[in-house]
Amino acid sequence: MADPVYVGGFLVRYDEPPGEAELFLPSGVVDRWLRDCRGPLPLNVNHDESATVGYVAGLQNVRAGLFCLGRVTSPKFLDIVQKASEKSELVSRGPPSESSLRPDGVLEFLSGSYSGLSLSSRRDINAADGAAGDAETACFKHVALCSVGRRRGTLAVYGRQPDWVMERFPDLTEADREALRNQLSGSGEVAAKESAESSAAAAVDPFQSDSYGLLGNSVDALYIQERLPKLRYDKRLVGVTARESYVKASVSPAEQETCDIKVEKERPKEPEQSHVPTESMSHPMSAVATPAASTVAPSQAPLALAHDGVYLPKDAFFSLIGASRPLAEAAGARAAYPAVPPPPAYPVMNYEDPSSRHFDYSAWLRRPAYDAVPPLPPPPVMPMPYRRRDPMMEEAERAAWERGYAPSAYDHYVNNGSWSRSRSGALKRRRERDASSDEEEDMSFPGEADHGKARKRLKAHHGRDNNNSGSDAKGDRYDDIREALQELKREMLAVRQIAPAALLAPAQLATPVASPTTTTSHQAEASEPQASTAAAAPSTASSHGSKSAERGVVNASCRVAPPLEAVNPPKDMVDLNRRLFVAALNKME
């Protein structure tokens, strides 16, 4: 049977509060739970109850925290560890030559693989106060060997002798060690009694797992975040620095420092070889790959001093860069600047070459230069001519000007700063427009704002294509209106030749008579009071004229009824034109 292995360490540190509330255990609660604890607690691997490897020989609540002393007794587990340690190159090297430790592959393998202790206890402190000491409601369930504990300061130290293990922790007093020895002897007597009772039958190994389960646990340990920084912090917190041990945590300083895990993450990497023997590692880590979960602090670049920099003007800086370009082409230069591309050579034009006729006249003057010169600046861009829409333009010409075609040889630049294009037939159409008769102008009446000014007619666009059928229909409608107005104009001219002698007498114009309204509805209302006056008037009009006077409208021949005009003659030419316009509107209706 293999020799047992003892493991010791703190399960709870009172000077280091945990980051999670469920892991907090006060000293008073620990004392109360220890009194209710019955029997030794099992010791397993990674809280796997099937991988029980021994038992907890002693639990002592000291000033620094809850200390545990366990014993690994499983032959199967120790045999697996022994075979695995023989395959490890790091373990096979043994302790350093200057160390007084004896080579022990099992202790070194356990110190590197299961470097922490973890206590399984009840989460609810209040509910655990009234719990009994049975296995179902016990306050402490078991202690596990793990890669790194969730509580800080729970570093595991392995050894073959219990006193040697307890001496690694400076926080334990002599009274604490004596109490642990008493618990260890009591648990040993209980274990001996149990082994004597089972001497008739083969002793059952508590380790029910296998090597595959241990391999799975080791793979899970690789994904623990910041495992090595936590182990370094735990080692300094516990104080396992001045005494040699098999702990595979990183190098710790010789003096005790204030522990802060947040500052520990930002510490620079410590040198692998130190001049102090107590600070050196038990085994060099040069041949071992760094685990995936570990983080290596990047090396900080030296800060630039004030006298390392020189201020230069921008022109001087660029001149230095330009002077260093020829040196960059030499062998071994650190940087090579790209060569400046030569300017493009212009094509040589031949006067007899038909393929070069599409080039403009400036291309005939270009010749390739003998030396590389900077490229010529681009020619100035001539703004496109702009011309307002000319109603005399054809559709094709107007579209060309609106799209902004460049001026051609048929254009000339006038003095007022605008472009003009000579079009065939333009002068002829301009003469026809200037010599147009009154028939091409819209009719205006006296009294209007634009009377006496020529107004252009609406031009019918009969020359458009079939796509402008809607515009042609609109032009035809304007032609009908124009013809009706021309007919009214001719009739009004005829009335002016006949009526002025009888209607525009000086005595009638001098008589202050109110001008009647020009609406047809008002004339109908005034027909009754004018009936008696119409009877006394001379009977020079026909019966048709008298009936029209009674109705208050103009007759079909545009001749004003004498009885109505005798009573209400027009006072001036404006009134006459208004009456004639009303008569024209009535005729159109």
Swiss-Prot record:
Record's compositionally biased regions (Low complexity): 514-543
Pfam families linked: Peptidase_S21
Gene Ontology cellular-component terms listed: host cell cytoplasm; host cell nucleus
InterPro entries referenced in this protein's UniProt entry, alphabetically: Herpes_virus_sf, Peptidase_S21
One annotated GO molecular function: identical protein binding
Compositionally biased intervals (Basic residues): 453-462
Short motif Nuclear localization signal 2, span: 453-459
Coiled-coil stretches noted in the UniProt entry, renumbered to this chain: none
The EC number(s) this enzyme carries: 3.4.21.97
Extent of Basic and acidic residues compositional bias: 264-273
Disulfide bonds: none
Keyword Protease (UniProt): yes
KW Hydrolase (keyword) present: yes
Keywords: Host cytoplasm, Host nucleus, Hydrolase, Phosphoprotein, Protease, Serine protease, Viral capsid assembly, Viral release from host cell
Region annotation (Interaction with pAP) ranges: 307-326
UniProt motif (Nuclear localization signal 1) ranges: 428-433
Site (Cleavage): A127, A128, A249, S250, A556, S557
Chain positions covered by the region annotation Interaction with major capsid protein: 569-589
Positions of the catalytic residues: H47, S118, H142
Biological process according to GO: nuclear capsid assembly; proteolysis; viral release from host cell
Stretches for region Disordered: 264-283, 421-478, 514-552
Free-text comment on this protein's domains from its UniProt entry: Region of interaction between pPR and pAP is called Amino conserved domain (ACD). The region of interaction with major capsid protein is called carboxyl conserved domain (CCD).
Family, similarity comment: Belongs to the herpesviridae capsid scaffolding protein family.
Protein name: Capsid scaffolding protein
Gene name as annotated: UL80
